């Protein structure tokens, strides 16, 4: 009898969420993870001002973790989103950013999704 499996992709996903949370926490923001949500938003970032007051200003975050998300096009990367996610992000009531993390290299890139979702193209240039 075999034991339950924990796929490597689950480890890679968790590494990405934890890495992004650490970056924003170190910057003084509040990172709120949405547990077990795969609808296109992995968490929220709330701004904290210089007086250490929360501001109620939020960003939604979509996190992608893994080498496979780095489609190198020379001077930039392209992330190919499916049409349903692009539509979802466009309709989202607050700004959405895409965070792509490569745990093998430690490279992390951020891009506003709102500015790329106007034409419903599935390409997001990073």
Model-inferred region functions:
Residues 1-39, 45-126:
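Mixed-charge (Asp/Glu-Lys/Arg
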């Amino acid at each position: 009898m075999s034991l339950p499996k924990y796929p490597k992709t689950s480890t890679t996903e968790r590494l990405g969420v934890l890495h992004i949370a650490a970056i924003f926490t170190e910057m003084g923001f509040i990172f709120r993870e949405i547990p077990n949500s795969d609808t296109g938003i992995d968490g929220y970032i709330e701004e904290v001002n210089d007086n250490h007051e929360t501001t109620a200003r939020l960003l939604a975050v979509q996190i992608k973790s893994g080498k496979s998300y780095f489609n190198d096009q020379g001077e930039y990367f392209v992330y190919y989103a499916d049409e349903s996610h692009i539509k979802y992000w466009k309709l989202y009531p607050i700004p959405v950013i895409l965070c792509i993390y490569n745990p093998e290299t430690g490279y992390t890139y951020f891009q506003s999704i709102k500015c790329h979702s106007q034409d419903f193209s599935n390409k997001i240039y990073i």
